[in-house]
Regions:
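An anion/pyrophosphate-binding glycine-rich loop and adjacent beta-alpha core
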Residues: 1-62, 66, 129-135, 171
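Short FAD-binding loop at a beta-strand-to-alpha-helix junction that anchors the flavin cofactor
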Residues: 88-110
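Short, glycine-/Ser/Thr-/acidic-enriched flexible segments
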Residues: 39-41, 75, 86-88, 101-103
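An active-site-proximal "capping" alpha-helix that borders the catalytic cofactor pocket
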Residues: 115-133
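Long, amphipathic alpha-helical stalk/connector segments used for oligomerization, subunit docking
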Residues: 132-215
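C-terminal amphipathic alpha-helical interaction region
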Residues: 204-235
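FAD/FMN-dependent oxidoreductases across multiple families
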Residues: 49-95
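Short beta-alpha connecting loops at secondary-structure transitions
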Residues: 2-4, 105-116, 153-159, 179-183
Length: 235
């Protein structure tokens, strides 16, 4: 895949190479293997100490003795919230800047360093434009209706039938769908299948149960609410 650059190939080339191997059946349990054993224990301890710890803690793998199962991971999705060149969205007064925004400069491929334009150039433009505009605008108070709507959604989740499925299953299926159809390789058919699946998951999400009914630092509720936002973003 990169006979000249070898292990120094760009993340773009490496990601496509890994996914091609997996898709064509040469992977192992949905991964390819990264072997560091030839470097020797001393080099691994001195120069790859963080990777040594992460592989041990999260994958249960000792990279001094066995290869690491790897696969392409989502850093961030190229093409986010649609904005103009000043970071202004379709919602008056709402800006999006940096890696969450899409100014339509780049395509869908996440190449090294192209986030600098998003963050440094358009991030600054957004800040300057927002600073200028805020001097000309008055601010409205948050309406009771907006707060009531959010509270009603929280109460609905807390009251859902305990027989409903847990948020983790829906979240896992969402991740698998996005990884399969909207990651390294994309086509129209796959994206249409993903959209249909996301809409199915949104319907199932309405019946998701929150096991912890507490109202203080309820992480179960927080993760469930986050899943709703993830489904909206995915759609």
């Amino acid at each position: 895949y990169a006979p000249n650059m070898m292990e120094l190939a760009s993340r773009d080339v490496v990601s496509r190479s890994e996914q091609t191997e997996i898709d064509e059946g040469r992977g192992i349990d949905g991964c390819v293997l990264l072997d560091c054993r030839h470097l020797g224990e001393q080099v691994i301890r001195e120069k790859l100490s963080q990777i040594l710890e992460i592989a041990r803690d999260f994958a249960g793998v000792d990279i001094r003795k066995e290869p690491i199962p790897i696969q392409p991971g989502m850093h961030y999705q190229m093409g986010g919230i649609k904005t103009d060149i000043n970071g202004l969205t379709a919602v008056p007064g709402l800006y999006a800047a940096g890696e969450c925004a899409c100014v339509s400069v780049h395509g869908g491929n996440r190449l090294g360093a192209n986030s600098l334009l998003d963050t440094l150039v358009f991030g600054r433009r957004s800040g300057e434009h927002a600073s200028d505009q805020v001097k000309k605008k008055s601010f409205a108070s948050v309406t009771d209706a907006s707060a009531d709507s959010d509270l009603a959604n929280i109460r609905r989740l807390l009251k859902n039938d305990d027989a409903g499925e847990m948020f983790g299953r829906v979240r896992q299926e969402l991740g698998q769908t996005m990884d399969k159809h909207l990651a390294v390789y994309r086509n129209q058919q796959g994206m249409e299948e993903a959209l249909a699946k996301v809409r199915e998951l949104k319907e199932r999400y309405r019946q998701v149960r929150v096991q912890d009914k507490g109202k203080t630092f309820n992480t179960n509720l927080i993760f469930t609410l986050e899943l709703g936002f993830m489904l909206d973003c995915a759609e």
